[in-house]
Structures are given as C-alpha cells and as structure tokens.
Design a protein with these regions (language model features):
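A short hydrophobic beta-strand segment most commonly corresponding to one strand
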Residues: 36, 54, 81, 96-112
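A short, N-terminal "cap"/entry segment at the start of jelly-roll beta-barrel domains
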Residues: 1-31, 113-124
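Short beta-strand His + acidic residue motifs that chelate non-heme Fe in jelly-roll/DSBH
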Residues: 45-46, 64-65, 82, 88-95
Length: 124
C-alpha cells in the first residue's frame, strides 16, 4: 500500500503552475496522479505524445481548447480526457488559479517540465 501526504510529494514547476506528483513511474503502478495548479491568466500550448491524460477540476475556472479551436469550459466538477494525445490549449481564467487532479498513463518519471517558450505545442 502506498500512502502519501501533500507535504511528502515531488512538486514541479511545470511552466505555468505547479504539479504535485503523488504517484510516479518508480511506484510501479503504471500511471501517475497529480494535484496540478494552473496559474490564473495563463495560456499553455500542450500535447502529450507519450501519455494519455485525464483531468478533473476541483477549483477555479478556465477552458481547454482543441487545436482546431473548439473550446470546452472547465469548472469544478468537469473532467476532460485527452484520449487521442490531443494538442490543446489549457487556459486559466484571470480571477483565480485552476486546480486539477490529473492522471497520466503511462506514468511520469517525475521530473518532466514543459517548454512553453516554443511556438510548437510543448510535450513530454
């Protein structure tokens, strides 16, 4: 059994917020679970070519926008899943941080960070 508290986990500044990584590849479960904060007013160009990701919003509001421009509002109680390694924009509204519980499969190593300075979608 694995039991972890927030103050015991790896915290990574992923580019536009913090990712608290509760489960990692080294845990041997095959997936990662994170508590991720997206800073208010930020827009991130993201794509996971080696991972599938599902995110459940627990705080804040924003939107996830497909590469084709289709926008989906995010608010507490909303889940979105990137089941096709979708390139997307993750946007946190101006008034507050967006907080998501995320699951990645396969698992992350734990040290991954995005390059948000690129004109391409950042990936890992």
């Amino acid at each position: 059994m694995i039991v972890r508290r927030l103050d015991e986990v790896t915290t990574v500044d992923w580019g536009n917020g913090l990712s608290r990584r509760f489960l990692l590849e080294s845990d041997g479960l095959g997936y990662t679970m994170t508590d991720t904060t997206v800073r208010a007013g930020t827009r991130s160009r993201l794509e996971y070519r080696r991972h599938l990701e599902a995110c459940y919003c627990i705080e804040g509001t924003g939107q996830v926008v497909n590469a084709d421009g289709t926008s989906h509002p995010i608010e507490p109680g909303t889940l979105y899943a990137l089941d096709l390694h979708d390139a997307h924009f993750l946007i946190a509204d101006q008034d507050a941080d967006l907080r998501l519980v995320c699951v990645f499969s396969p698992a992350l190593r734990g040290d991954e960070r995005h390059n948000l300075d690129s004109t391409d979608f950042s990936e890992y």
